[in-house]
Amino acid sequence: MLFEIIYIVSSLFYIVSIIYTLMRIKHINTVAKKEEIRKEIIEYMRSDEVTNIIVKALNESDINKKLNAIVLALCTHVQELKKSKLCEG
């Protein structure tokens, strides 16, 4: 009877340890995948492609066009600004 109890307890311990090990492996793989995805996103965000997309979007935006029109009007009509850095570029 004692041998059967020891066998059952050791079998249960073995099963629980296998389940725990599998859960840890799954967790480690999940963390590794998230870290890999994060690194790829950071690498993409630092790429020239994203920079070009952002610059193009800013240059084509209505706000930038309006700002350029305001600067042009100021540089044309305000005498003090004609020789400023704002109007030289």
From Swiss-Prot:
Report the locations given in the UniProt record: Host membrane
Principal location class: host cell
Q: Does the keyword Transmembrane helix apply?
A: yes
Tell me what topology the record assigns in the membrane: Single-pass type II membrane protein
Which organism is the protein's source?
Sulfolobus islandicus filamentous virus (isolate Iceland/Hveragerdi)
> What keywords were assigned to this record?
Host membrane, Membrane, Transmembrane, Transmembrane helix
Domain of life where this protein originates: Viruses
Protein name, per record: Uncharacterized protein 43
Cytoplasmic-side segments: 1
Q: Which GO terms describe its cellular component?
A: host cell membrane; membrane
Transmembrane helix listed as a keyword: yes
* Stretches assigned to the Extracellular side: 23-89
* Annotated transmembrane regions: 2-22
